[in-house]
UniProtKB/Swiss-Prot annotation:
Keywords: Hydrolase, Serine esterase
Keyword Hydrolase: yes
EC number: 3.1.1.1
Family: Belongs to the FrsA family.
Pfam families: FrsA-like
Cited function: Catalyzes the hydrolysis of esters.
EC main group: hydrolase
Gene Ontology terms, MF aspect: carboxylesterase activity; hydrolase activity
Reactions accelerated catalytically: a carboxylic ester + H2O = an alcohol + a carboxylate + H(+)
Protein name per UniProt: Esterase FrsA
Source species of the chain: Yersinia pestis
Domain of life: Bacteria
Length: 415
């Protein structure tokens, strides 16, 4: 990897790149909907993006570093596409969201290249990968600068694995439409292959490299491997649009695991965050012979997709993410809402029907996107359901405890 010049090559100015918040051409409300969510972060006055301090800190970024980068963005006097929103600086320059986070990532990349201690070098590369991922956030289709930051994130993630005490393999899976899909298999130092494996289904605004901490702290010590696959229209899966068959890609990966020698294909479970739970639960119904168990936190499987009042409270950024994933960047909210109804697993005739696959669903009280009833619907549909209530405070500690309980439950179901 030609690390020294990669960022210069990728971000070499060619033309005036469109600013992220202008890519989806729905009518933005521009009023602040006060949202506080454990998994999604907070809305903030005069910011287009949700500011997700918990998850960014959980991934390993210093909270002070987060505030430092945000302050650089907030102080910019450069041209904005929307003068009311701080993170809408036009062009790849000081104050632009992608520029500032990528610049921070490049600093850690340089430190990693100069570091002689393998453990420190690996951590520095991981820091760079996390910062490049935030630069790319929320990963809207057609955002060229964002896509270039994704390339840097994936390359840094692969570099980190060369120094850290686990094995990372990039696997390629054939897809029925003639394409191929790449995913990362993380293999533990505990035990020996073939490993029980968790197939990770992240949210619509995350990359597969964002879940390293889940593997390192919760799965790896138990001798469990983790396979990450991006959701359709995100990252390595960007060529596929998200359709009502949300598990289209993950199902084909699941069916191919019998041919992967490092994976015990008879001991595979699925873990879904947010909309990733839609994929995970769907797999529990469609592939009960291949899936030992399904776990999900803050699931989006029915309520938000079918409740117009709830959808009206969703911040602009998240509605833009949905429109981008569905290939509906020019649609009205009414058309988008109608289409989203079809993504409900209850509307599809799955949830509510008895399923033999064990399912765990965790929820936070007053979660704006996923009420307790959502998790209860999942658990009551399973012949072996477990409901996990996660207290909101203290936020970080309870998130950690929820992941511990979930990983222990998955370990038990894969024995």
């Amino acid at each position: 990897m030609a690390q020294a010049n990669l960022s210069e090559i990728l971000f070499k100015p060619k033309f005036k790149h469109p600013e992220t918040s202008t890519l989806v051409r729905r009518t933005h409300c521009n009023h602040v909907v006060n949202i506080h969510s454990a998994l999604d972060g907070d809305t903030a006055n005069h910011w287009y993006r949700m500011i997700n301090r918990l998850m960014w800190t959980w991934r390993g970024i210093d909270p002070l570093e987060i505030e430092e980068v945000l302050s650089r963005i907030a102080c910019s006097k450069a041209e904005h596409s929307n003068n009311e929103l701080l993170d809408t600086v036009v062009g790849y320059r000081n104050g632009n969201w992608i520029y500032e986070w990528a610049n921070q990532g490049m600093m850690w990349q340089q430190k990693a290249m100069e570091e002689t201690d393998p453990g420190s070098a690996g951590q520095f590369w991981l820091n760079a990968a996390n910062l490049y991922s935030i630069a790319s956030y929320p990963h809207l289709k057609g955002d060229e600068l964002s896509e270039q930051a994704e390339v840097l994130s994936n390359r840094a993630y692969e570099e980190a694995a060369k120094y850290l005490p686990y094995t990372l393999k990039e696997l390629t899976f054939p897809i029925s439409d003639g394409g191929s899909l790449s995913g990362f298999l993380h293999m533990p130092t505990v035990g020996s292959a073939p490993f029980p494996t968790v197939l990770m289904c992240g949210g619509l605004d995350t990359l597969q490299s964002d879940y390293h901490r889940l593997f390192r702290d919760y799965l790896e010590p138990k001798g469990i491997a983790m396979l990450t696959i991006d959701l359709p229209s995100v990252g390595a899966s960007s060529r596929w649009k998200l359709t009502q068959d949300t598990s289209y890609l993950h199902q084909q990966v699941l069916q191919a695991l019998a041919d992967v020698p490092w994976v015990d294909h008879q001991r595979v479970s699925v873990f879904g965050f947010r909309f990733g739970a839609n994929v995970a639960v769907r797999l529990g119904y469609l592939e009960p012979q291949r899936v030992r168990a399904v776990a999900c936190l803050g699931p989006i499987v029915h309520h938000l997709l079918c409740n117009s009042d709830s959808l009206r409270k969703v911040p602009d950024m998240y509605m833009d993410v949905m429109a981008s994933r569905l290939g509906m960047a020019d649609s009205t909210d009414e058309t988008l809402n109608t289409e989203m109804n079809r993504y409900s697993l209850k509307t599809q005739g799955l949830l509510g029907r008895r399923c033999q696959t064990p399912m765990l669903a965790g929820f936070w009280e007053n979660d704006p996107f996923s009420p307790k009833e959502e998790a209860k619907l999942i658990c009551s549909s399973s012949a072996d359901g477990k409901l996990l209530a996660i207290p909101s405070k203290p936020l970080y500690e309870n998130f950690h405890r929820a992941l511990l309980q979930t990983s222990e439950w998955l370990e038990d179901k894969m024995r």
